[in-house]
Amino acid sequence: ELPAAVRAWASADVPVDFHATHDAVEREYTYHLHSPGASLSRAEDAVEALSGTHDFHNFTPDETGTVRHLDGNVVGDGEFLVVTLTSDGFPRQFVRRAVTVIDAVASGAAGLDRIESLLGEEPLDGPAGLAPAPPEPLVLTAVEYPPVDFEPDASALASARDVFGSNAIDYRTNARVASTIAEGIDREQ
């Protein structure tokens, strides 16, 4: 049984040897990066520099599977940059580390030369390395499994909408409460 926060709303018949990780031919991740004041233009330049086929060995602790083709996009949404990355596979922590450098470039803390050095052959560890961004804003938004054809379940879809709709209201409410407290603290100063 899945935890209450995990929802499946479609299923498919697959061969016995099907493997959800290894049989996927494309994955898409979306990261909601809170970065007020960031330059969308600089973020777009960073995503463009990361796009294409590269050895991303400095973006993961993995020793193998680091050469990947990446397609990316970023849009501004208020105080957020919404970063979408698509590939045939992602090494561990790759998306979160890519977001770290996109944020650094977008905020002006780093230039595009930072991406060039991270894509270089030299391993960069410690202070020269790249820490992963927090996991909470990361969403796996699509996975492609040809020729698997998923069939949505109407009641599961309705349940998922209800759960995530309720979660959205709860989180917005919590954000308002936290903002009220922060504003109250500021007034006391």
Language model: regions and residue ranges:
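Structured-RNA-binding interfaces characteristic of tRNA pseudouridine synthases
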Residues: 1-189
